[in-house]
């Protein structure tokens, strides 16, 4: 067996048998950051750097660690020089998931089985660009070739969803492309909060003067998304907080923030608690799956943030106090208010895996027969690795029902990232296969085949469509 062959990452014989059952399943990519405009316009890529390196802060972060100049990462260096800089980095990136992902992409998308190195970088650069043109590689072709059944984009709550509408009306591909409601700017600590209120008023024609009118305007946007095929929401919190407030306090917090005053951490916590609760009420009404990402400390390198903006590879894993206390109180309150929607929770700090999975298990009871209505999401961001995936599945299996897990998502800005689903499926097959080897489960390939098939595709489809 050699690196990156057909049995790549399949570490035992049962894994090979299980992988065959899931290798060709469709992909249900329920959370990503792809641009629906790019999907609709479907332009053929002219340069591999635009497709492979553009906007990919995972690669940028690794290149900086390898001493590559910013000019060759995000600057004005030629595309060939940027490609060579990436090759110099990748050839030394043993142990990093990018080494695996990148070579899977080269083999599975472009048919290139040799390893990318500094020595062959220029030749492969031209070979890849020729392939793009000869095979007319475009977003829709990549989506179709990867057998993607569903794409959930991530969208600003004030987006008019023009490109989603056009895709729904006039798209030659079978893939459903649905918006996801992402209202980060509705939370009072966001730097664009006041600008968001101004634009919210313009779009909804609701004058925001107090908490109730703000919620009314937000509700109008949630309904708009629901009318245009939205199946999910998403939010990113630095930490999970819970602090009750009176309506008068919430009005005071809003008015203070609107005139530029500081509201303090307590004000931030009270607003987060209240607005998220109201949003969850709306999400349940419309049947949205509510996704929560938490634990990221963002934009830590001030110089790069000011020069390049957000999402450029300078973010960290955070920590917090009272996670389980706050989360239990929050979920309990949502249950009491009959405002608990289906949810997927993603934590960035793996030290909280067991605590999160354990807490979610407290609130699975429902009369609708929903299986694991509160999901512990796949290893996110810095945990999107072999060990990260295994740690997440261990915690889920030990504290809940891994059989109900909705599985993998790309969470990516790249149309080449669908190979991450294959990577996950290989790791899943080995993970379950090892149970067979260790005699921890019966050697029942029919039943275990259904188990891995559900996690790879069918659970997600059911969770988002029923």
Swiss-Prot record:
Pathway noted in the entry: Carbohydrate metabolism; pentose and glucuronate interconversion
UniProt KW Isomerase keyword: yes
Catalytic function, reaction form: D-glucuronate = D-fructuronate; aldehydo-D-galacturonate = keto-D-tagaturonate
Cysteine pairings via disulfide bonds: none
Species name: Streptococcus pneumoniae (strain 70585)
Protein name: Uronate isomerase
UniProt signal peptide: none
Any one Gene Ontology BP term: D-glucuronate catabolic process
Keyword Lyase in annotation: no
Keywords of this entry: Isomerase
Family classification: Belongs to the metallo-dependent hydrolases superfamily. Uronate isomerase family.
Domain of life: Bacteria
Stored Gene3D superfamilies: Metal-dependent hydrolases, uronate isomerase, domain 2, chain A
EC number(s) on file: 5.3.1.12
InterPro entries: Metal_Hydrolase, Uronate_isomerase
GO molecular function, one term: glucuronate isomerase activity
Pfam entry (one): UxaC
């Amino acid at each position: 067996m050699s690196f990156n062959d057909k049995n790549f990452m399949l570490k035992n014989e049962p894994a090979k048998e299980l992988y065959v059952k899931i290798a060709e399943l469709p992909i249900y990519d329920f959370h990503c950051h792809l641009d629906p405009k790019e999907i609709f316009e479907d332009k053929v890529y002219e340069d591999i750097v635009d497709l492979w390196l553009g906007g990919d802060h995972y690669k940028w972060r690794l290149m900086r660690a390898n001493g590559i100049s910013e000019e060759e990462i995000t600057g004005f260096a030629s595309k060939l020089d940027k490609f060579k800089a990436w090759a110099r980095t990748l050839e030394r990136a043993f142990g990093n998931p990018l080494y695996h992902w990148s070579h899977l992409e080269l083999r599975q998308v472009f048919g290139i089985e040799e390893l990318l190195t500094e020595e062959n970088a220029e030749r492969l650069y031209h070979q890849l660009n020729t392939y793009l043109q000869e095979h007319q590689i475009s977003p829709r072709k990549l989506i179709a070739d990867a057998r993607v059944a569903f794409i959930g984009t991530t969208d600003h709550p004030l987006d008019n969803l023009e490109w989603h509408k056009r895709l729904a009306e006039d798209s030659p591909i079978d893939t459903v492309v649905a918006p996801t409601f992402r209202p980060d700017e509705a939370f009072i600590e966001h730097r664009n909060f006041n600008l968001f209120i101004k634009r919210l008023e313009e779009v909804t024609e609701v004058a925001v003067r107090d908490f109730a009118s703000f919620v009314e305007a937000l509700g109008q946007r949630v309904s708009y998304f629901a009318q245009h095929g939205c199946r999910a929401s998403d939010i990113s919190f630095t930490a999970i907080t819970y602090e009750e407030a009176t309506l008068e306090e919430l009005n005071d917090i809003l008015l203070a923030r609107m005139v530029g005053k500081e509201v303090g951490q307590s004000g931030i916590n009270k607003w987060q608690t209240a607005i998220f609760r109201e949003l969850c009420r709306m999400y349940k009404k419309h049947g949205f799956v509510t996704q929560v990402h938490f634990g990221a400390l963002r934009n830590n390198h001030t110089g790069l943030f000011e020069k390049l903006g957000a999402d450029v590879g300078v973010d960290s894993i955070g920590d917090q106090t009272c996670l389980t206390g706050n989360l239990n109180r929050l979920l309990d309150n949502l249950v009491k208010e009959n405002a608990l929607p289906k949810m997927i929770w993603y934590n960035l700090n793996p030290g909280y895996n067991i605590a999160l999975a354990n807490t979610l298990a407290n609130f699975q009871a429902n009369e609708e027969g929903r299986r694991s209505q509160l999901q512990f999401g796949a290893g996110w961001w810095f945990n999107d690795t072999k060990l990260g995936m295994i740690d997440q599945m261990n915690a889920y299996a030990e504290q809940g029902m891994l059989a109900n897990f909705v599985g993998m998502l790309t969470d990516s800005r790249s149309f080449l990232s669908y190979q991450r689903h294959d990577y996950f499926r290989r790791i899943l097959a080995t993970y379950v296969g090892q149970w067979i080897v260790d005699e921890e489960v019966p050697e029942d390939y029919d039943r275990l085949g259904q188990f891995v098939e559900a996690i790879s595709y069918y659970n997600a489809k059911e969770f988002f469509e029923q």
